[in-house]
Amino acid sequence: CLVNPRACNETLLNYNPTDNPKSVAVVGAGPAGLAYATVAAERGHRVTLFDASAEVGGQFNLAKQVPGKEEFHETIRYYKKQLEKLGVNVKLNTRVDADTIAAGNFDHTMVATGIVPRQPNIPGIDHPMVMGYIDAINGTRPIGKKVAVIGAGGIGFDVTDTITHDGPSAAVDIDVFAKEWGVDFENHPRGGVTGVEPVVAKADREVWLMQRKETKVGRGLGKTTGWTHRL
């Protein structure tokens, strides 16, 4: 499971109550920080969770905006409820330094600050027309009609899917789902499959997805239903 390491390991990984409660600081409220904070609190430790942003979730807040991945909203909702239920002291809009940790007199500090987007050292990378994936997914900057996406890994595919999609996502709109997959819920044809070409709402944009490897694009992606949609 993406968020529950105990799934299928219930007899191997147990969160037993601690005999020696500690004061714990967790820096970063992304997936790793949320998991650590909730488990530590569940075991009986006193946990303070810091994050520089205004909400918990880290890069899950990007993932939930990708068409078909809206279920990450529920993951974040679950963790918010767990933080409240377990009494974790959450401090948002807070940048942490050594003085912050020292002032809190914590017994342990867990650093879960995630990653910094890689910026390749190539000519023109600082041009105003160039943006990172965070701006592209959040829609904080305008995106042109012709786009080159450098990198064909999971993030490259997510960015491409996001900027080429138009309208509601099939994951949250039944009518859109039926059109994209060519399904007739009235079961007029056999099996409920309409027999027509699926209709996918596409943005008026051309995208070139680039990678350095000579292998087929997408070959390194996990073989899961999350990547079954053809761009």
What are these regions (language model features)?
Residues 8, 62, 213-217:
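A short, flexible beta-alpha/helix-coil linker loop
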Residues 130:
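Gly/Ser-rich helix-loop-strand patches that form or flank binding pockets
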Residues 1-21:
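Cysteine-cluster motifs in flexible loop/terminal segments that predominantly coordinate metals
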Residues 110:
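N-terminal Rossmann-like NAD(P) cofactor-binding module of classical short-chain dehydrogenase/reductase
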Residues 2-6, 48-55, 61, 121:
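Iron-sulfur cluster-binding cysteine motifs and their immediate structural context
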Residues 58-106, 218-231:
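N-terminal Rossmann-like dinucleotide/flavin-binding domain of flavoprotein oxidoreductases
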Residues 3-6, 84, 88, 168:
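Generic secondary-structure signature for well-ordered alpha-helical cores
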Residues 18-52, 91-102, 113-122, 126, ...:
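Rossmann-like dinucleotide/flavin-binding elements
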